[in-house]
């Protein structure tokens, strides 16, 4: 949940 710019890991 670190790349809240393109995906939601």
Swiss-Prot record:
Q: Which GO terms describe its biological process?
A: defense response; regulation of blood pressure
Q: Tell me, what does this protein do in biology?
A: Hypotensive neuropeptide.
Q: Which organism is it from?
A: Phasmahyla jandaia (Jandaia leaf frog)
Supply one GO CC term from the record.
extracellular region
Q: Which family does it belong to?
A: Belongs to the gastrin/cholecystokinin family.
**Record carries keyword Glycosyltransferase:** no
Q: List the disulfide bonds.
A: none
| Positions bearing Pyrrolidone carboxylic acid | 1
**What keywords are assigned to this protein?**
Amidation, Amphibian defense peptide, Hypotensive agent, Pyrrolidone carboxylic acid, Secreted
Residue numbers of Phenylalanine amide PTMs: 9
What's the domain of life for this entry? Eukaryota
Question: Where is this gene product found?
Answer: Secreted
What name does the UniProt record give this protein? [Arg4]-Phyllocaerulein
Instruction: Give the tissue specificity.
Output: Expressed by the skin glands.
Residue ranges of coiled coil = none
């Amino acid at each position: 949940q670190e790349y809240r710019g393109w995906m939601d890991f």
